[in-house]
A protein has these predicted regions:
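A conserved beta-strand element that flanks and buttresses the S-adenosyl-L-methionine
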Residues: 125
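Class I (Rossmann-like) S-adenosyl-L-methionine-dependent methyltransferase catalytic domain
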Residues: 1-53, 58-117, 133-219
Length: 219
């Protein structure tokens, strides 16, 4: 077990992201109120851009994703670095009916993406993930995303006035603004949409998810 896996396994085992709520062990951003918009956004993007397959880089406990899995018009692969999470997801989705493939894999997502052929993934979803990872790791992920995927959905925090690094402590976190260096240098030219991804009950104007197109899968 590497250092990243140890940290995030501890977070899940100790329920450190639950913050006193009872809905999702993946944290407040995975709760029902915080995911109403992303559920509709994801289904819409899959339909509009004719997505045939997608990878969820850090699927977590599927609290909100499980709601829309039956309606996905594409194959779905959920990755997570925490083995117990993947084991639970495999068991918990056995009875979901969908004509498309639904699979899960225990792996660090950067390592997995490096094993894939170029342009082999229509859509990468990386929601509420990079905020918890060192800048160097995030940049390497972005480079791989540009190589393997046609589209990327990635969380951004518009209120952040500068990007800083994060140490791998017990609960690593800092907001990331994708439209500022060093990330803007890699991604700005490819951005095609920026969509609200905050709670439904009250608007959090800084919480968005950006859509990037690196290659077109449309004929």
């Amino acid at each position: 077990m590497n250092s990243l896996e140890r940290i995030f396994t501890t977070i899940y085992d100790k329920d450190l992201w639950n913050m006193g709520q009872s809905e999702s062990k993946s944290g407040l951003g995975s709760s029902g109120d915080f995911t109403k918009h992303i559920q509709l956004t994801l289904l819409d993007i899959i339909h509009r851009y004719r997505i045939k397959n997608m990878i969820d880089t850090s699927c977590g406990d599927l609290f909100w994703m499980k709601t829309i899995l039956p309606f996905l018009e594409c194959d779905y692969l959920g990755l997570d670095i925490v083995k117990s999470v993947i084991d639970a997801n495999k068991e918990g989705t056995k009875n979901i009916e969908n004509n498309h493939v639904i699979e899960f894999k225990h792996t660090p997502f950067l390592e997995y993406l490096r094993s894939l052929p170029s342009q082999s993934v229509d859509l990468l979803l990386c929601r509420h993930t990079c905020e918890h990872l060192p800048t160097e790791y995030v940049i390497e992920f972005m480079k791989e995303a540009k190589r393997v995927s046609n589209y990327l959905l990635l969380t951004t925090h518009k209120h952040a006035i500068a990007n800083r690094d994060v140490e791998l402590t017990e609960t690593p976190y800092r907001p990331i603004n994708l439209n500022l260096p060093p990330y803007s240098d890699l991604l700005d030219a490819y951005q095609i949409e920026s969509l609200y991804d905050g709670p439904q009950s009250h608007i959090r104007s800084e919480m968005y998810i950006n859509l990037y197109r690196f290659h077109s899968n449309l004929i």
